Amino acid sequence: RGTQPTLAEFGLDARTEEINRAAVLAVRRAVGDRAYASASIGPCGKMLKPYGDTDPQAMYDSFRRQTAALAAAGVDVFCIETMFDLAEAKLAVQSAKETAPAIPVLATMTFSPTPRGFFTIMGTSIQKAAAGLQEAGADVVGSNCGNSTELMVQIAAEFRRHTTLPMLIQSNAGLPVMKNGVAVYPETPELMAGKVAELVAADVNILGGGCGTTP
């Protein structure tokens, strides 16, 4: 949540570059050269017109400000994730590619099951997401978050029908339930691991974990 509009809610928008640089440096201190530093870029927290009052150029500029700071700090990968609005996702991808063309851009959206198939809460289908993200310049496409690893297998299979790009899947450990005031994710490591073969069979190229998972 390092975009300027989100930070502005806390009076920190003037420190957008500083905060994003600090995040990258913290990762570098932790992992050194043993791992890639991936910059997670989520929704900016504002709605584009006509659903909200944000102009596309203003949203693009906010993403550009963030991606420029991340690139200058030496991030290895941009991971644009948990997107619901395809138009916003495309602006984020475009800003990353135009800021630093040599840095790979991974772009994932979050889908829910409906009687008509999988859609984001803004009504974007997997087919439209795959085409739109590729058109914007994403190097890798896919899905993150979601309802369960089981459903992610279905989402991955649907994505592969509509793209030849490398695919990234990062599932939550199911939907959380509250127990004694604490959010508990129901899927066990064994359950999630048991779905890996199915995800690989669906031609997923990069596997990760979302909320409720650990390294």
Annotate each language-model stretch with its function:
Residues R1-P215:
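Domain-level signal for soluble alpha/beta catalytic cores
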